[in-house]
């Protein structure tokens, strides 16, 4: 049985996606913000820092790739990280890829490969998205965070780079 997961994405989009938005979705998008909203406490935070890194790529053929990195990640002391350094680096990133479908206001990502093997074979659901000029904003439904188990929703925004 496949688990249904919700991808990291944005809160508070007032207007639903249109058919025009889905046509504008393919491209290369650079992450510009990541905001975490804890459902139980109402607390907002920037768990990836003020300037997160990463890219989201959607192709016209239905494929996607997503990477996200915390700002100010620890730099290993040598070219080959120690196991402790590897663990610290691993805790400050996400990455996954696969195929996607636009279903009305939602984007359904079917995961083929991921930094966390437990995500492979799952679907990430992006509840709402909006493409405005060169900006992509995405909204998630509440989901359990893999870093600490808290029930959260996440806001991500991107700038089109290609």
Model features per residue range: what roles?
Residues 10, 16-162:
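Lipid interaction determinants
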Residues 1-6:
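Bacterial N-terminal signal peptides that target proteins for export
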């Amino acid at each position: 049985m496949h688990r249904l997961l919700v991808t990291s994405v944005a809160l508070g989009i007032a207007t639903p996606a249109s058919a025009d938005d889905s046509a504008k979705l393919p491209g290369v998008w650079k992450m510009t913000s990541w905001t975490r909203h804890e459902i139980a406490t109402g607390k907002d935070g920037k768990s990836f820092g003020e300037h997160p890194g990463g890219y989201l790529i959607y192709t016209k053929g239905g494929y996607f790739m997503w990477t996200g990195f915390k700002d100010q990640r620890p730099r290993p002391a040598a070219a080959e990280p120690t196991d402790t350094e590897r663990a610290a680096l691993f805790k400050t990133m996400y990455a996954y890829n696969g195929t996607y479908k636009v279903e009305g206001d939602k984007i359904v990502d079917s995961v083929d490969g991921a930094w966390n093997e437990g995500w492979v074979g799952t679907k990430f659901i992006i509840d709402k998205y909006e493409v405005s000029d060169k900006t992509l904003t995405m909204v998630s439904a509440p989901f359990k965070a893999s870093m600490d188990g808290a029930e959260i929703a996440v806001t991500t925004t991107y700038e089109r780079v290609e």
